[in-house]
Amino acid sequence: MNIAVLGYGTVGSGVVEVLTTNRETITKRAGEAIDVKYVLDLRDFPGDPIQEKIVHDYQVILDDPEIKIVVEVMGGVEPAYTFVKKALQAGKSVSTSNKELVAKHGAELLALADEKNVNFLFEASVGGGIPIIRPLNQSLTADEIDEITGILNGTTNYMLTKMDTSGADYDAVLKEAQDKGYAERHPEADVEGYDACRKIAILTSLAYGMQVDYEDIHTEGITHITETDFKYAKAMNMGIKLLGTSRREEDGLFALVAPRSEERRVGKECRSRWSPYH
């Protein structure tokens, strides 16, 4: 089976590497070999074996009947949305890790995939390697979900844990996270809560069967959390986590991303409450 990968950045190159390194195992599980025929990118990569597969014109991929699956790892809404929509319209299945795209246009793209009898898959957009999308789509379809709450961003969870355990301030912990590669040089998507917001929008849309625009969800990040906040939290035997939550209410849905104070786990019981750190 021939596939095309859209984007050859950190994620795209990782996809190609995994498919190459684990080729034998993947072939056994898939029942056939999966070959990367094209990689779409604006850049060239002289000296890299991938260069022979690089294309700059997306139409080449659309017009090739051998391409059955398009893997979109470009990030952002555009041009990813346009490219994914065209792939589905051309009868090609799409797999994406693009949480912003799924949160904004997921319902439309799922409907289009169903109409064209192909797949639009986005398990990697939420939870990394934790399977959550498929259970919501398949295993829990007969259940009525009342609430979803979780830690949806690993970077901020690492930072808050370090602030809690070491007493370090926000700036010091952010620099450490960046030095270790846990946080980007421009970390706004993580620390302002935007990443978690897009993820809770995706989960909410799937759980409750309606499109939820992440721009409508009130979102607060962790940039205002201080050492003093942790001192007060510890005095109450609480910790602080950035949580995304959504729940069904009588007049619709409630969704929020914000720091939340959570009672430290004792035995099997754990209680939480909304944080006053606004």
Language-model segments: which ranges?
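N-terminal glycine-/serine-/threonine-rich beta1-alpha1-beta2 phosphate-ribose binding loop
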Residues: M1-Q89
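A short hydrophobic/small-residue beta-strand
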Residues: V94-S95
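Conserved anion/nucleotide-ligand pocket segment
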Residues: Q138-R198
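Rossmann-fold NAD(P)-binding glycine/threonine-rich loop
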Residues: Y81-K86, K99-G127, I133-L136
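Short glycine-rich anion-binding loops that position phosphate/pyrophosphate groups of nucleotides
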Residues: G75-V77, N153, R260-E262
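Substrate-binding/catalytic subdomain of NAD(P)-dependent oxidoreductase enzymes
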Residues: V173-R265
